[in-house]
């Protein structure tokens, strides 16, 4: 545990609650003190849904600490069973309530006797895993529970579908553009003649999990959540899975060829090459755009990419391979998947950063001074302070990245959206010059951009006037170099003379 005002991945119980609230008719009981129960508010604020968040907090208060939690937890489970009549009640502690070291499995066993619903304790170590790892583990636990239950009852559906079919595993509530990506994947599979067997967990019922073995293969759109479930199904039922994400023109084609290979081994050979060619050359605009003069203007520009493993890795490859943009640094906060990430990006970027500390990311951005950043909401904040444009490509995000319109990141339409995002994130070449030349009406003041919240430097009036004369595209860099020089030499006020002294010092 650590104290931080910004976390890229939340605590483990958030991942478990995301799984529970993604399924239909599943209720979560969160055994937690006040302060840990913000999930309901967060989901209600961010997700564009009309239903209530199915999470109840069983509050740990002074009475619980005096008498123990069993009575209260069991009462909450049985009460929700009678009120909501859910198919499953999922009990989870938080990292705070885990300190009490209570036997929650015993509470679950007792509540199961009095409840008509299935009751499960989330099998997650709250001190060792983060939100994404916990969600991955909880989904696998729920799937395993219902597969084993169906097997005992003799109603497990092991008969394969007549036509090629797939399960899509890993579409979640509060996911980054998950609903849009799901629609795009469904459309892609429909074009390829592949039936959708089940989509889990978003919008599905736990009672349908017994149908998972019907599918020919499993498709994992994001490796952060869903991979454990796919590996379990592969081990139990020899079901192949695809974890090659269709993000960008090149990797979408690779993913389709992988589907072709799996389907062809199970029935007569299929050929999707003509579909790939048609989509790449005539339907998708991204391939054409990458060869246009507009995109060529971006060639060689420096960018930084940071986010979850899936989005950061594939975004790095899109920028480097498809658009000719130099990725100065690619990074992820998924430290548990660092080996895979390095393997994916090391040949497409200058350096790799694996960290969950936002200050390290901020310092790296300030040091490299890229033309654009592609990251999370935090990198967007950093970019604003350093006057560097930022395109958001990964969770964690705020409300503006839960759009009402259709904005997928996967498939051929996703490639179009990414091309737009990339181009619009870079400052257009003549924009700053035109503002400088014709901007007599422009009242924008040049302000100090720094990652430090307590700047100890002031700019004199003549210093600011001199700074305004410098073209916008290099102004930020000169300003930071001047401030660095001033700090190193103990100067508190920056004048024109200090600016020239800093320039001379830099040139020597």
Curated annotation (Swiss-Prot):
Keywords from the UniProt entry = 4Fe-4S, ATP-binding, Chlorophyll biosynthesis, Chloroplast, Iron, Iron-sulfur, Metal-binding, Nucleotide-binding, Oxidoreductase, Photosynthesis, Plastid
List the EC numbers from the record: 1.3.7.7
Q: Which residues bind substrate?
A: 429-430
Taxonomy, superkingdom? Eukaryota
Q: Which family does it belong to?
A: Belongs to the ChlB/BchB/BchZ family.
Q: What cofactor is needed?
A: [4Fe-4S] cluster
List the protein's name: Light-independent protochlorophyllide reductase subunit B
Q: Cite the binding residues for [4Fe-4S] cluster.
A: 36
Q: What does this protein do?
A: Component of the dark-operative protochlorophyllide reductase (DPOR) that uses Mg-ATP and reduced ferredoxin to reduce ring D of protochlorophyllide (Pchlide) to form chlorophyllide a (Chlide). This reaction is light-independent. The NB-protein (ChlN-ChlB) is the catalytic component of the complex.
- Organism encoding this protein: Chara vulgaris (Common stonewort)
Q: Which gene encodes it?
A: chlB
Give TM segment ranges: none
What InterPro entries does the database record attribute to this sequence? ChlB/BchB/BchZ, LI-POR_suB-like_C, Nase/OxRdtase_comp1, P-CP_red_C, Protochl_reductB, Protochlorophyllide_Rdtase
Q: Which GO terms describe its cellular component?
A: chloroplast
Instruction: Indicate the enzyme's highest-level EC class.
Output: oxidoreductase
